Amino acid sequence: MAIAFKSGVFFLQSPKSQIGFRHSSPPDSSLSFKRFTPMASLSTSSPTLGLADTFTQLKKQGKVAFIPYITAGDPDLSTTAEALKVLDACGSDIIELGVPYSDPLADGPVIQAAATRSLERGTNLDSILEMLDKVVPQISCPISLFTYYNPILKRGLGKFMSSIRAVGVQGLVVPDVPLEETEMLRKEALNNDIELVLLTTPTTPTERMKLIVDASEGFIYLVSSIGVTGARSSVSGKVQSLLKDIKEATDKPVAVGFGISKPEHVKQIAGWGADGVIVGSAMVKLLGDAKSPTEGLKELEKLTKSLKSALL
């Protein structure tokens, strides 16, 4: 299967029947969420700002948003809960939480492997929501879910939106739905106060990009390169001109993601005028490669601090 960039989001060039979301026996609901305390003090206040409002506040302070991504349930949901606290305590402004899916065609090998491990442990949407219901009140930054469309369809658009909002989720990214097919998604998101973030890419024509930025809520997700997610050695110089084009079309904040893994990447993108920087595979790899969950969380803290400091 190939991924084409259509309408500024990922359009899967594959048969319409997709591999279904794997449902395994639900994990033990008595999850422990108190295993690890980072060196930075943990916040215990509920998020009060949504995505767009977070960017507005940061802009007033002359700051750029740091947005890390991790996969829910890798290596397990208890560790995910602790990771969310660590990311929040280390100064993350928004956190993207990936819902594992069996056919994640927009993702590179690191996040694909994390999704596979998570699904094999029995992670599903219900267990993720149960975890978030307990953890969101303990953190101060908003959570945005990153999920493929299949899990949403399985639950039903309205029920999905209401259930994620009920546990405190503020934003949503659905990478495999082209713009023309987002109308119902946007309607249900609006009805449930969920900010639906849309993506634009280096191959998106200017006129289509303008339609995307007009429809996007929360912020504009600028994909920095063609292809799947994954750390890269450098950031494409095209990002600077893409940012300029988008900012000429909208006043909405723009965050850049895909391939960003180092403090120098973060600093460079911020210098080009991005309102936010998204880092995913580097975070996921640390948690996946660690010898133990505690080691992974400590390494996650170190990386988060180094990336965040590049924006200060």
From Swiss-Prot:
Annotated tissue distribution = Mostly expressed in roots, hypocotyls and leaves, and, to a lower extent, in seedlings, cotyledons, stems, inflorescences, flowers, siliques and seeds.
Task: Briefly explain the null phenotype.
Answer: Compressed root wave phenotype on tilted agar surfaces. Reduced accumulation of tryptophan, but increased levels of auxin.
- Does the record carry Phosphoprotein as a key word? no
Q: Would I find Ribosomal protein among this entry's keywords?
A: no
List UniProt keywords, sorted A-Z.
Answer: Amino-acid biosynthesis, Aromatic amino acid biosynthesis, Auxin biosynthesis, Chloroplast, Lyase, Plastid, Transit peptide, Tryptophan biosynthesis
Give the protein's recorded name.
Tryptophan synthase alpha chain, chloroplastic
Family per similarity comment: Belongs to the TrpA family.
